[in-house]
Amino acid sequence: MNTFGKKLTLTTFGESHGKAIGCILDGVPAGLRIDEAFIQSELDRRKPGKSKLETGRKEDDKVEILSGVFEGLSTGTPIAMIIFNTNQKSKDYDNVKDLFRPGHADFTYFHKYGIRDYRGGGRSSARETAARVAGGAVAKLMLKELGVEIQSGLCEVDGIKGNVQDFEYAKSSKLYALDPAVEAAQEEAILTAKENHDSVGGVVLTTATGVPVGLGEPLYYKLDAVLADAMMGINAAKAVEIGDGVASTHFKGSQNNDEITLQGFKSNHSGGTLGGISNGDTLIVKTHFKPTPSIFREQQTITTHDEEVVCNLKGRHDPCVAIRGAVVCEAMMALTLADMALLNMGKKMDHLKCIYG
């Protein structure tokens, strides 16, 4: 499946070493001011090659809007956006065209489809997430009109955990670190792994404030369930926590319950959802990313002809995919919340009367 969402749908297309990648965002209400500079700035945050902590592949990621916008406003029709690939080096993958790279989707794609684009992983490459960020930027513009703000940052790298959640600091950090006190250690861990032809994992914290009460569609389209689905659909994501997540299994009910006052909740262990519906508190999501599977070490694998061989990779790869993954997490949260906002419009007669009355 290449489409995400119910009322607001994002369909992406393209491959890592193809001519272009892009998306079609359908369901955006007419009359939304489309800030193209903002969309580009979001792509610039995710684009590769900004520092030695990222892949050496340099792409401008310049986005072009093809449809759905007239005189700066959304028209209510599908918004199509395209990003042309300009820095492919497909020859780097000639030596792996007949073998399966450990940790990658090569093995499963080949056995599912009987054919695969071996150049940079083709459709399974994280390059595709640029299209998600473009669509997510439009969703952010929608949510801004509703007073919703989404932020993210790395709270852990290679087991080095931060204790501070400074989202303003993360905006200027090369690795989107939330805790300045551990940023240097986290950066050193990434660079050391890179020097040793290895990679590291990380954890991204994504939050949303200003979320209205009532978003989420029980029982099978709950807000927390869809957020988990959205994050798990990102390349290299291996686990998702909502609120206190796994830690809540170690609490007593008396510790885990968020008591309620007329001023609001006294705590936020639930992470902003109850019964799969937003409760008005801050949405809190942690996404755990595995180490980048592309490492420059000899590894055992097999070929498409069932031969055991040694794999030696080439190319340009992120030593820690979680860094740029933070921007993608924001995009997926934005798409989820914007979709939920549209779905919620018809849940009360009062809502319909406001529109049609």
Curated annotation (Swiss-Prot):
The gene is aroC. GO terms for cellular component: cytosol. Its EC number is 4.2.3.5. CDD domains: Chorismate_synthase. Gene3D superfamilies: Chorismate synthase AroC. Coiled coil: none annotated. GO terms for biological process: amino acid biosynthetic process; aromatic amino acid family biosynthetic process; chorismate biosynthetic process. The keyword Amino-acid biosynthesis applies. Belongs to the chorismate synthase family. InterPro entries: Chorismate_synth (IPR000453), Chorismate_synth_AroC_sf (IPR035904), Chorismate_synthase_CS (IPR020541). The keyword NADP applies. Pathway: Metabolic intermediate biosynthesis; chorismate biosynthesis; chorismate from D-erythrose 4-phosphate and phosphoenolpyruvate: step 7/7. It is an enzyme of class 4 (lyase). FMN binds at residues 123-125, 235-236, 275, 290-294, 316. GO terms for molecular function: chorismate synthase activity; FMN binding. Homotetramer. Its cofactor is FMNH2. It catalyses: 5-O-(1-carboxyvinyl)-3-phosphoshikimate = chorismate + phosphate. This is Chorismate synthase. Reduced FMN (FMNH(2)). It comes from the Bacteria.
